[in-house]
Amino acid sequence: MALPLWALTFLGLTGLGLSLRSRKPESFRSETELNHLAVDEVTGVVYVGAVNALYQLSADLHVQQHVVTGPFMDNKKCTPPIEASQCHEAVLTDNFNQLLLLDPPGKRLVECGSLFKGICALRAMSNISVRLFYEDGSGEKSFVASNDERVATVGLVTSTRPDGERVLFVGKGNGPHDNGIIVSTRLLDRAEGREAFEAYSDHTTFKAGYLSTNTQQFVAAFEDDFYVFFVFNHQDKHPAKNRTLLARMCKDDPSYYSYVEMDLQCQDPSDPQDSAFGTCLAASVATSGAGRALYAVFSRDGRSTGGPGAGLCVFPLDKVREKIEANRNACYTGAREAGRTIFYKPFHGEIQCGGHLIGASESFPCGSEHLPYPLGSRDGLVATAVLHRGGLNLTAVTVTAENDHTVAFLGTSDGRILKVYLAPDGTSAEYGSIPVDINKKIKQDLALSGNLSSLYAMTQDKVFRLPVQECLSYVTCAQCRDSQDPYCGWCVIEGRCTRKSECSRAEETGHWLWSREKSCVAITDAFPQNMSRRAQGEVRLSVSPLPTLTEDDELLCLFGDSPPHPARVEDDTVICNSPSSIPSTPPGQDHVDVSIQLLLKSGSVFLTSHQYPFYDCREAMSLVENLPCISCASNRWTCQWDLQYYECREASPNPEEGIIRAHMEDNCPQFLAPDPLVIPMNHETEVTFQGKNLETVKVSSLYVGSELLNFEETVTMHESDTFSFRTPKLSHDGNETLPLHLYVKSFGKNIDSKLQVTLYNCSFGRSDCSLCLAADPAYRCVWCRGQNRCVYEALCSNVTSECPPPVITRIQPETGPLGGGILVTIHGSNLGVKADDVKKITVAGQNCAFEPRGYSVSTRIVCAIEASEMPFTGGIEVDVNGKLGHSPPHVQFTYQQPQPLSVEPRQGPQAGGTTLTINGTHLDTGSKEDVRVTLNDVPCEVTKFGAQLQCVTGQQLAPGQVTLEIYYGGSRVPSPGISFTYCENPMIRAFEPLRSFVSGGRSINVTGQGFSLIQKFAMVVIAEPLRSWRRRRREAGALERVTVEGMEYVFYNDTKVVFLSPAVPEEPEAYNLTVLIRMDGHCAPLRTEAGVFEYVADPTFENFTGGVKKQVNKLIHARGTNLNKAMTLEEAEAFVGAERCIMKTLTETDLYCEPPEVQPPPKRRQKRDTAHNLPEFIVKFGSREWVLGRVEYDTRASDVPLSLILPLVMVPMVFIIVVSIYCYWRKSQQAEREYEKIKSQLEGLEESVRDRCKKEFTDLMIEMEDQTNDVHEAGIPTLDYKTYTDRVFFLPSKDGDKDVMITGKLDIPESRRPIVEQALYQFSNLLNSKSFLINFIHTLENQREFSARAKVYFASLLTVALHGKLEYYTDIMRTLFLELMEQYVVAKNPKLMLRRSETVVERMLSNWMSICLYQYLKDSAGEPLYKLFKAIKHQVEKGPVDAVQKKAKYTLNDTGLLGDDVEYAPLTVSVIVQDEGIDAIPVKVLNCDTISQVKEKIIDQVYRTQPCSCWPKPDSVVLEWRPGSTAQILSDLDLTSQREGRWKRINTLMHYNVRDGATLILSKVGVSQQPEDSQQDLPGERHALLEEENRVWHLVRPTDEVDEGKSKRGSMKEKERTKAITEIYLTRLLSVKGTLQQFVDNFFQSVLAPGHAVPPAVKYFFDFLDEQAEKHDIRDEDTIHIWKTNSLPLRFWVNILKNPHFIFDVHVHEVVDASLSVIAQTFMDACTRTEHKLSRDSPSNKLLYAKEISTYKKMVEDYYKGIRQMVQVSDQDMNTHLAEISRAHTDSLNTLVALHQLYQYTQKYYDEIINALEEDPAAQKMQLAFRLQQIAAALENKVTDL
């Protein structure tokens, strides 16, 4: 049966969750060590300071700019500028970035390095390669940062006052060659003769007063209100300890009167003795629900406490402020003597407190010269750590708030990010840990992105971008709840884990369940609690918490696999009808549990579920053997027993006779109390039993029996319900006892029987007399002397009560030490019935103390031997109840003295683990358990016992010689002179290589010292699953902790061992791998300063095409990926069959080796298949082998002698080759000459117009500067999102601008509106069913009359309708796309895919790209496109434009080129706009312009700062010229227009004789005088009665039509003349092209340059295409290139380029459109891989851009290549991006109108859609056809109403 929709959704979400988690974090790697990181909160740009480098990265960590900052010649002692003559000690020195700060108001970046005494530079934030200020010759006043990289520098850029200048506050320690300044305030702008970075005033610095250097290490600087704060560590000398201090000063305090500092202490709650952490490592200030606070992480080095530790403390800033003010007040007004113990003067010594008036601190909030300053206090703030960790250090902290919940992200010393929730009550909870860069410390700069969605972390050489939450990866409410992520909660109505802001109804009660409140929607109770499977009724479910639901939420009940049905809701109770069908009851049960599922949104969202039992009374009677009535009446259901029919059935509400109701099982007829309870085997026994409640039982015919032993006997009835029967002789050999449950039948029906007896066998397991007499007396077993065995007493006539004497068969051990004290075990028979029977034991003449704990009846006695004075061998004697037993001669015990003589080896590691071999005599005395070996009281575990002893040493606290001691049975035996020496553990100094493939087998050379001490080495890998992967693999199979031991190694000497790396699990990224070298008992991590040993995934190889490689040259080539990631050329091996293939080259993707000259035999020869007798090609990397196919040598031989073959074959072949080469050379030379000739001509033409291009380009740039200023003033007129999508989606539709989707009008009578809208919303829900929508689309596309235009329109309507759920829209598009791709691949023409938009999905892709790239157009690519459009428009309008023929002098299009030379002159006219009070505006026009053209240019100039849609139309204004006192209205056509026969010429300014400098007045009219589209039907004033054939012209009058009688030859000449004219004017095309070239290049670079940020949608879709190509095994790069080209450049960019009005509020004239078409065609040519050879017949546009096309093609190739190399965009990131677009813009679209339009298609093809839905099983299950019918019923009058 098909899965329900919610289950499919769940599976999809599960896949999404896995893909979300499987992605690796985005990262950037630096070649040098990283120092600092800063993030621009507005642009998202990331700035990174490193050693010798600065980086400007995009938000996704792609490099935008890279600046080299070192190394340079310097010495810490020298003063810059560094000159060799002045600084002889200067050497090439690295530049460590000491300070990296942003100044967003100034759009600049502050960076200071360690070179040149720590001077700083200002750089542009937009481009860090632009240095705004740098001065290295100002001397000490410009030394800002420390020039010692070990001394930290912190800073803060702020303003001294709200409107004050920007300054830099700096805090740094005092390095050995620093200037001693600790705290300073620096200028950022020149002021009052001071340069940037000089001190703000002469007093704004504090210098160190200490003699020692580097006593301060600054941690952080921050601001709060009008104060600046510093956090730093200070090393006190007396006593020597570290203090963490917080310093504060006023921003606007040029003299530092306000400086005050105090201690900060962070208490460790886990260590009351050493209760405070010592050093602050990182600090961050954040505002959370509890207010603004300082969050600081502290560490403890662990030297005194046995290990490192760290804690997080919180210091609320209001408490900081209170404490500082209290300290100030105490110093100002307190006693002087008392203040000396608390207060001090930082940097200078003692301070004089006291003597000031009360209130001085309030009167002088920023201190004063007469008050003590600077002020330090040892009385500071103390906080208890809200989080503490042992074993590691916390190295970074940043804090944020989500819905007033405080979240801290903490970096650790082992390369992880801890996610911690800080509760309002002061407690904390770590809810996640992200392994960022294992065993690499997280650096202090931990930053959040501006939108708080990402976290940037930095290690030694990498920057990582991590999501702050992964809510969408938790696919169930339980997973969401268990994550405990404060960002996440379960969005009930959407059935997914989201942030609160992403849940549409989060503010409604019960709709967003916060993860930390640990609640999910659950069914807490059901009434009734169970139901008979044969009953019908309602089930009332108590649901908590039940979200508030509306009628539209459609709550459904689903019982098991039954169809869902609507549920009713009453308060917090959901009422469901019982299902019509119930699964069968499982065998052995009386009920079946059926899952009740509550679903929302037509079954697409799972709410909760509950197991509900349906019971079956017919099965209840057979649950207990032989007790049908009791089983029925005693179960937990309401079943009852029918005495008449002997059946179990459901209870009836009415009283009935002959019924035993539920829980009245005592009333059942039954038989019980058998006597006797035990029955001997092989003996007939009389059994009596009782009856009860037998009134309805016919006791006259009763039978008793057992199905197990297959017997049945008649029952005899006695008085008082007593019965009896006689058993036959029963036997069963398998056991001592056998429980029997006897049945009782009456007329074939079972009566309840509790007759349980036990059948027993006396002989079983009782082989001797003692064992027999020890049996349970109830069995009445006796030892029968005559039979010599144990039997039932009635079966024996010769019973004895006494047993024979004991028999001893063997002892263990057979030897013992003279000191005794060991246990001896005596085995035999008749050794007594109980322990008390054993009276005395003698071993070798010595008493042996009985040990009752080891006694076993009759078979075993254990005793402890006593000491013996001398060695002796003797027997064993046992006294059992006065009967003596003696051991036979071969069972003897020997007293002997063990004597150890020597031990090997004599030394081993301190960690232990050495196996010692002890030699001596009689060492095998006793048993292994009796021997104990110690080394200086440290146990040596005995592993081997015999003539030699072996033991494994334990760990010793210190190295040295120790004595070996051996104990036997507690007594020490002498071992004179035997000692063992513990040596220091071996040490690993280096290893190489640093990595291995997961399959292992790589030789790892480990060097160090002390290896000769070791006996056994092993390379051990501990694979600990990462927490995130544990959750990820919960469905696919949990990951377990794995420990792998590699025992293969070669020992060389004391300093070198070579290991073979062991194989580890195949997913190394899923585990935290710890690699150790185990040396006996010592384990050392395989980690040195060079790095940590790591595993990488195995390489992949491509198999040979067809499985066989033809060997035609000397090398075999194999392809793959990651081949050299953990393998070198020297290590790699390859084989051809049984022989080696000599390795020649190994790169990341290629392997070359030289095979044997003669074909070797295969490794595994096949007998029958001759093809398989070819040798295999095998690649071996370490332990793993890859068989890539077989190698076929060319083994053909000829009987013809070689001396004949060479002349006969070679001579003709050489002749043919020579002739062919000559012919080919001639043809190539001819084509090359033609190509070079054309190219030369083109270059010559370009050269001839180059000077003109330069001049015109310069003029254009000057004029475009005004345009640019207008753009900056008014902004680029980008359309709003709705208008943009309307134009992109619907302009191609047949109704154009009048399309109802654009107008947004839906005319519905008010009386019908609620019904219609409700139905449309239901239709929207139906569209959100994937099954319905796919069927809907397939059905429409199968209709013949569903044209390509209709598909385009339908897809656009669908885009608008689903815009609110773009993630779902994308899923639908992907599904349809996979189907489309399958069709093309099956048809073997994949290159044709996406060439047009002939399917719905192709248009959906166009719309999807348009949606996803809108913001990119708006932010990035829009400006160069707009400037290109304006440049073309400006250049076209500089020359004549024929208003009738739409041709221009300056154009890129040869068909739109104005052929004739037209005389014209530029004019500048003054224009006054009437009634607007604007001064006269100069406007440039041409004297050949028509009046309409003049109007357009005037409007363009006057209203240039307004969007085009706000401009007046040319036909709505009147142009008036006032040459003198008179006024003349100018128009295109009037009575003065020039006439020539049938032709009338349009008036121009020249016609009216308007001169340069003339004044024109523009005024508006009420009624349009001329239609707007007059350009198409130019001023046709056709008065049929006066002139039938009036024709108009402007600049060039068309020639009369050629007579029909003209010959074809004449026509050919005309064509040639036209072509000649075009070529003549080609220079003009080149001139325009050269003028516009920069704008064209800028646009191409903005779209195709890899340096620009690529929209995530492009990366996402291109990766999708790559994946599908790989899936379908499409290796042809041309095909993939075509797919990408058709999906983005040709589908989107060409469309936007040809139609700028789609994105901008502009009007595109035909002459501008013609030039745009040429550029668009060039863009299209650049995207094709086909090479176009130029000839004289080539189109002029291809000739125009012949030189540039190769550059553009490379840009496209590089663009595609760059995208492929980008970090993958995960499904989660894409869905988040799409969700943001949905939220931002959906409300502005005409969704309701789109739904109505879509419904028209449903109405048109109603029957076909219904049939399709009814034939689809999934649609049937969800009742989609029925739901559509309901919607159609609601909308049936809609068409007529509309």
Curated annotation (Swiss-Prot):
Residue numbers on the Cytoplasmic membrane side: 1223-1842
Highest taxon of source: Eukaryota
Cleavage, annotated site positions: 1168-1169
Keyword match Transmembrane helix: yes
Knockout consequences: Embryonic and perinatal lethality, due to defects in brain and neural tube development. Mice exhibit abnormal cortical layering and defective migration and differentiation of several subtypes of cortical neurons. Cranial neural folds fail to converge in most embryos, leading to an open neural tube and exencephaly. Likewise, mice exhibit defects in the embryonic development of the cerebellum and the olfactory bulb.
UniProt keyword list: Cell membrane, Developmental protein, Disulfide bond, Glycoprotein, Membrane, Phosphoprotein, Receptor, Repeat, Signal, Transmembrane, Transmembrane helix
Pfam families: Plexin_cytopl, Plexin_RBD, PSI, PSI_Plexin-B, Sema, TIG, TIG_plexin
Compartmental location: Cell membrane
Repeat as UniProt keyword: yes
Stretches that traverse the bilayer: 1202-1222
Carbohydrate-modified residues: 127, 242, 393, 451, 798, 919, 1053, 1072
Span of the signal peptide: 1-19
Membrane topology, from the record: Single-pass type I membrane protein
SUPFAM superfamilies per the UniProt record, alphabetical: E set domains, GTPase activation domain, GAP, Plexin repeat, Sema domain
GO biological process: brain development; excitatory synapse assembly; homophilic cell adhesion via plasma membrane adhesion molecules; neural tube closure; neuroblast proliferation; positive regulation of axonogenesis; positive regulation of neuron projection development; positive regulation of translation
GO molecular function: semaphorin receptor activity; transmembrane signaling receptor activity
Gene3D superfamilies referenced in this protein's UniProt entry, alphabetically: GTPase Activation - p120gap, domain 1, Immunoglobulins, Phosphatidylinositol 3-kinase Catalytic Subunit, Chain A, domain 1, YVTN repeat-like/Quinoprotein amine dehydrogenase
Listed InterPro entries: Ig-like_fold, Ig_E-set, IPT_dom, Plexin, Plexin_cytoplasmic_RasGAP_dom, Plexin_RBD, Plexin_repeat, PSI
Residues with the Phosphoserine modification: 1240, 1248, 1574
One GO CC term on file: collagen-containing extracellular matrix
PROSITE patterns linked to this entry: SEMA
Assembly and interaction partners: Monomer, and heterodimer with PLXNB1. Interacts with MET, ARHGEF11 and ARHGEF12. May also interact with MST1R.
Protein family (similarity comment): Belongs to the plexin family.
Protein name per Swiss-Prot or TrEMBL: Plexin-B2
Gene name tied to this protein: Plxnb2
